[in-house]
Swiss-Prot record:
The gene is adh1. Long-chain alkyl alcohol dehydrogenase that can oxidize a broad range of alkyl alcohols from ethanol to 1-triacontanol (C2 to C30) as well as 1,3-propanediol and acetaldehyde. The best substrate is ethanol. Also oxidizes glycerol. It comes from the Bacteria. This is Long-chain-alcohol dehydrogenase 1. It comes from Geobacillus thermodenitrificans (strain NG80-2). It is an enzyme of class 1 (oxidoreductase). GO terms for molecular function: alcohol dehydrogenase (NAD+) activity; glycerol dehydrogenase (NAD+) activity; long-chain-alcohol dehydrogenase activity; metal ion binding. Keywords: NAD, Oxidoreductase. Homooctamer. Coiled coil: none annotated. Belongs to the iron-containing alcohol dehydrogenase family. NAD(+) binds at G98, S99, A100, L101, D102, T141, T142, S143, G144.
Amino acid sequence: MSVARIVFPPLSHVGWGALDQLVPEVKRLGAKHILVITDPMLVKIGLVDQVTSPLRQEGYSVHVYTDVVPEPPLETGEKAVAFARDGKFDLVIGVGGGSALDLAKLAAVLAVHDGSVADYLNLTGTRTLEKKGLPKILIPTTSGTGSEVTNISVLSLETTKDVVTHDYLLADVAIVDPQLTVSVPPRVTAATGIDALTHAVEAYVSVNASPTSDGLAVAAIRLISRSLRKAVANGSDKQARIDMANGSYLAGLAFFNAGVAGVHALAYPLGGQFHIAHGESNAVLLPYVMGYIRQSCTKRMADIFNALGGNSSFLSEVEASYRCVEELERFVADVGIPKTLGGFGIPESALESLTKDAVQQKRLLARSPLPLLEADIRAIYEAAFAGTIVEPHKA
């Protein structure tokens, strides 16, 4: 593209101990009555206390809202927005994975708007956001979604997903502290980590890629490739957690500015129809989508192979692109995620409905370097079911 639109959140604190910046930022924003939106499990294990205790010690009024579930349905979004509207809050803090952060963004913005959440959905909504809403601070506790730096809130519908998206959803402050991720269990570490990798990979091959997003994406891939396996094997590995937090943050910035594409388009129906975690949906499809589009972006796939730790010095560009797909397959397997749709209990009979839903994700599909039509999408799902990489001429 000739002119790139580059957007970053106003302010981020990134690094071990970054949570120490929370109280100063709350003071700077002039808040008094704070709504914290978080996962109930994070309250149970005491992690949310690390956020709320310093605030209460400073005399702030803090209400903790925990009606948060993974892959939140539209109804959950409506409830969070209604709660934010009814309260007299002047700041929203999101603490958790992508679901909690997405709900926090949604509640903060729609708290000052009329109508339902459904009115503002990307695919079917009829209204547009007109006001910034309440200030928001986003604090991720996983290294994967990148929600703390994007302007999107994802909601599950009956069989697929839709989004509310506008720059008003951007955080006023993002606080990325790797020490908050140390307690994340291996499977979640793996799923969110591959989610971050997918963000970087898809941003790098996106038709909207720019030199800025390219630099962010490659740096993210390097960090994730060297540290995700370590973080899965040993959650207390401080350097691995630091690398993953930074990698996820950079990947989030990359895909926010370049966009994600086919992997996410095909992953959304897996979550909508079978309630598979978003990161795992991306992970199982990543090698198959990238293998299918490989011929349309061989140079970039070769670059990704090198960023993953490969060495293409003695390989042709085409050979390196093949090796990239193989490495992505190996990476997903190494962190323990099933390599086929059947591994998640998805029957072959579901491929038709998955295809019909994925075709509707035009916003995502438009960014693919290879236009993916209905037949292409069906071929990729069939490949992911069979566990065999296919390309268009072989499909």
